[in-house]
């Protein structure tokens, strides 16, 4: 992988374990070190988006807890205190260098709704054009488990795709991806570069992670899958390594680089369908139609739909299934489940299709085969 001199927009994700002291509280020294590195990139002309964990870690002791709580209400209460404290610290440190930081708290529903998804992107672009440093975190105080991103690794990857970033840098307490767990296996070897996340690469992830954060190595690989599919480079390295950010964007850092080679990246619409939309139902397709959809050769017409499962509206994203029940793709439908199921409604659509050859159920431009 050679240095990319055209790189401009970088998303940096840092986890709780890289921001806290041995006692689990936010370390100002570590925050200062991170801010100094972000400032160095800003001074060099880069746009930087920071996805920062640490709200719960910053707040739980203020509630009288001795260690990080496990129950959701206690974690959310901790985050409600800690997020403000964390942003106050970031703002002061960036202002000392002449930069303004903004806070963006996101929930998964902000990404699953396409209108809100586009609105978040537009807001971030304005901030970046004005030289602001957006600091992003999941809105832990109001998010319930079933609607969470899971961890900030996933959030960072989706943010990178949202704003067409050139690179995602994930800073952790481990200096890259190994072929085993380096904490328990001294013979484990670091993998310098990954061009495809294969089952063998996934097997290397194990369950390595820290007790302070929520994201282990497996979640990081899932994040890099997203950015690689979106045509974005990735890097995983150790947060406390000297000048890690500057060296990472110049392809000179110690860690693991991720880059998809020889694949066509997903466009914005395809990214939203694949990673954010949240399918609402299923359509079982004929064998001939399934084959064409899998090969990206055709839109989905009425005669290719054999069965409908679930309820959905026109404009919803649904799963496209073959006759064996295997998911073969996702698509935005032009008709509701009611229109496609009720005899009178379906007859009306059939008559329309006989007149209008473009009366497709799902256009090829708004469908995505699952590989």
UniProtKB/Swiss-Prot annotation:
GO terms for molecular function: ATP binding; glutamate 5-kinase activity; RNA binding. The keyword Nucleotide-binding applies. ATP binds at residues 13, 172-173, 214-220. It catalyses: L-glutamate + ATP = L-glutamyl 5-phosphate + ADP. Residues 280-356 form the PUA domain. Belongs to the glutamate 5-kinase family. This is Glutamate 5-kinase 2.
